[in-house]
A protein has these predicted regions:
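Extracytoplasmic/secreted proteins, especially bacterial periplasmic and envelope-associated proteins
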Residues: 40, 50, 54, 71-74, ...
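Secretory targeting and sorting signals
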Residues: 1-32
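Secondary-structure edge/capping motif, primarily at the C-terminal ends of alpha-helices
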Residues: 59-63, 111, 118, 150, ...
Length: 195
């Protein structure tokens, strides 16, 4: 029974639901939260770190070493050239990417340790390393673009606070676990270099 003993029929329920849906659909969308100054930069660093798991899985399955100095040098040379093209200090960019590579390797070493202690959790399949490298190359470009965009801010007195705020936002948005939080802190440790 409904108010006053009247039972609504299906068509009136459908009409009511449709009207309610229309009201919800017509309601103005909440404005998206504005991005923090370094949020896209830090998010790109987090995305690049996320490649550590599939890369580690590939290396685990194929028996490859975690460190790959030739690949690291190729990445560092490429981002330094990109930095030069942007008119920013290539040595700064090399330093930032050295941290990023080391953090990625740290995650990979952690995964290898976990899989060694608990072989049942070790991967049995992994993507082709070329797929991960294509993703990494794209993120490298994004990172250099973001560094160039925020060059002055990365060298300002307010950098540390902006970096801390952006990191907290990315950690929350991506739900990063303690390992990835530590890796992100390590990957971004050289971002702020006030002049």
């Amino acid at each position: 029974m409904h108010d006053g003993g009247v039972i609504p029929n299906r068509s009136s329920l459908f009409l009511g639901a449709a009207l309610l849906a229309g009201q919800v659909a017509l309601a103005p969308a909440a404005a998206a939260a504005p991005l923090l100054p370094f949020q896209q930069l830090v998010d790109a660093a987090a995305q690049r770190l996320a490649t550590a798991d599939p890369v580690a899985a590939t290396k685990w399955i194929n028996g490859g070493p975690i460190t790959d100095p030739a690949r690291a040098n190729q990445v560092l040379d490429s981002v330094a050239a990109d930095a030069t093209a942007h008119g920013i200090d290539p040595q700064y960019v090399r330093e930032v990417f050295t941290d990023q590579i080391a953090a990625n390797e740290g995650v990979q070493y952690t995964r290898f340790g976990q899989w060694k202690f608990d072989p049942g959790t070790a991967p049995t399949s992994a993507p082709d390393l070329a797929e991960s490298r294509t993703q990494i190359n794209g993120l490298n470009k994004t990172l250099v673009d973001e560094i160039a965009l925020h060059w002055n801010s990365l060298h300002s007195q307010g950098c540390s606070q902006d970096l801390s705020d952006a990191t907290a936002a990315v950690v929350a948005a991506r739900g990063l676990d303690p390992l990835y939080q530590q890796a992100l802190a390590s990957a971004t440790q050289s971002y702020c270099q006030p002049i």
